Amino acid sequence: MSQPEYIRERLDSLAKIDKQLVDVLHRASLTVSSLIDLKKRNEESKPQFQQNAQEFYDDLESATVQLRKEIKLLDENVGTRLLPIQTHKKATGQDNVKLEEQFKLLTKYLGKDQQS
């Protein structure tokens, strides 16, 4: 079963954002590493630290903007392209109950009697 074009686009966009966030973490690691070198009185690493810090902020800004766009698209499409989903924040364990209910219905419709 293929996914609708809209869903595929959203998943591709989220995968791209995920890669950007990995880059942000990598850049943060490089920035901290160059800061440690700088703290050890290695003044030669100052330009490297500045470059890493700038690239960290650039990557973070890009990922944040893309993620906000995806959230906005999600908000705009709830109820039109996507089903409205209402969950209660304190309803943590109800997902297992619902899952078991769905499995029971599925086995009933398939004609299989499953003992739990």
Curated annotation (Swiss-Prot):
Pfam families: Med11
Coiled-coil region(s): 48-78
Subcellular location(s) per record: Nucleus
Key words of the record: Activator, Coiled coil, Nucleus, Transcription, Transcription regulation
Tagged with keyword Coiled coil: yes
One GO BP: regulation of transcription by RNA polymerase II
Transcription regulation in keyword set: yes
Functional note: Component of the Mediator complex, a coactivator involved in the regulated transcription of nearly all RNA polymerase II-dependent genes. Mediator functions as a bridge to convey information from gene-specific regulatory proteins to the basal RNA polymerase II transcription machinery. Mediator is recruited to promoters by direct interactions with regulatory proteins and serves as a scaffold for the assembly of a functional pre-initiation complex with RNA polymerase II and the general transcription factors.
Membership in a protein family: Belongs to the Mediator complex subunit 11 family.
Quaternary structure note: Component of the Mediator complex.
Protein name: Mediator of RNA polymerase II transcription subunit 11
